[in-house]
């Protein structure tokens, strides 16, 4: 297995060099899971960066549910020059939940590669309740109002020009955070895999978020394995409703049983093309929009 993985990294599977055009050239995957992690992962960050670079990708955003990844992004960039790698912080219980201090320290990390703030994922109240778990959770709102600490985190996101990523809230909580972000001057916002549980945004809610300046994320992980809830047809319909100019395609790969990230992206692109999404729209959603979200264009 290790020998095969090394070969894939070294050759980029050999497929892109055979293609007249490489559909991964210039792609930025904003939703990447990899080792080191407390959850088993298919590949580590350095090997993934090498693989993505050899496949022609422009960049990666490293996501860890429990550890900030800005420091990891700095190290990966030194080890694998030629690919833009970013990190962030996911406001789960391991970093104190909705903790402004965690955001401040992430933003100040050497290199300035910490860009994303996920507003709690696996420990969010919505996720814990949806999963019917009896354990502590991170709350972003109460009685229909964002908590003061949530507003404080959003203020820091605006101050440091970071990306507000909604994480795993309810759909209405995601909209509340997007409204607050817009009010406080946040320039970069994305609704994390908006269609997937526990968010389950409707088409109308996705369009509302988009009209407030947020990108809507669609991930390959929502189409396969244990997380499969939707079909390519469902995704294509939603993309047409919202408009490709407001959408981002990402892999959300890294699970041991799933494909490697570049292959997940290719499968996502191919499936959407079969449903009538054009190559120009895919390029917009996988290359241009992620770059704008990260402030690269």
Regions found by a protein language model. Give the residues of each.
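Divalent metal-binding pocket/active-site signature
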Residues: 34-43, 116-201
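A metal-dependent hydrolase metal-coordination microenvironment
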Residues: 42-136
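Short acidic/histidine-rich active-site segments
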Residues: 244-261
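Mid-to-C-terminal alpha-helical segments outside catalytic/metal-binding sites
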Residues: 264-297
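Distinct, well-ordered alpha-helical segments
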Residues: 72-76, 171-185, 201-210, 231-239
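Bacterial N-terminal signal peptides
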Residues: 4-14
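Structural preference for beta-strand elements that scaffold enzyme active sites
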Residues: 27-29, 59, 84-86, 114-118, ...
């Amino acid at each position: 297995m290790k020998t095969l993985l090394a070969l894939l990294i070294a050759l980029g599977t050999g497929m892109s060099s055979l293609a007249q055009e490489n559909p991964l050239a210039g792609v930025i995957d904003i939703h990447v899971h990899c080792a080191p992690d407390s959850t088993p992962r298919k590949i580590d960050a350095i090997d993934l960066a090498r693989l993505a670079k050899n496949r022609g990708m422009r960049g990666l955003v490293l996501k860890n549910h429990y550890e900030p990844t800005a420091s990891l992004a700095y190290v990966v960039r030194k080890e694998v020059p030629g690919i833009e790698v970013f990190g962030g912080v996911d406001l789960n219980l391991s970093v104190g939940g909705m903790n402004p201090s965690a955001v401040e320290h992430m933003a100040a990390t050497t290199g300035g590669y910490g860009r994303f703030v996920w507003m709690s994922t696996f420990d969010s109240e919505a996720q814990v309740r949806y999963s019917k778990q009896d354990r502590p959770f991170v709350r972003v709102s109460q009685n229909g109002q964002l908590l003061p600490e949530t507003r404080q985190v959003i203020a820091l996101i605006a101050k440091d020009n970071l990306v507000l990523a909604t994480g795993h809230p309810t759909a209405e909580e995601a909209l509340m955070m997007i409204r607050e972000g817009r009010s406080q001057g946040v320039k970069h916002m994305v609704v994390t895999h908006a269609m997937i549980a526990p968010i389950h945004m409707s088409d109308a809610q996705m369009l509302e978020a988009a009209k407030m300046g947020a990108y809507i994320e669609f991930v390959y992980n929502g189409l396969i394995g244990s997380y499969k809830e939707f079909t390519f047809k469902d995704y294509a319909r939603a993309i047409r409703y919202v408009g490709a100019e407001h959408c981002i395609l990402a892999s959300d790969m890294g699970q041991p049983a799933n494909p490697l990230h570049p292959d997940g992206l290719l499968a996502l692109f191919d499936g959407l093309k079969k449903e009538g999404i054009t190559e120009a729209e895919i390029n917009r959603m996988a290359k241009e929009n992620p770059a704008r979200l990260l402030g690269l264009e």
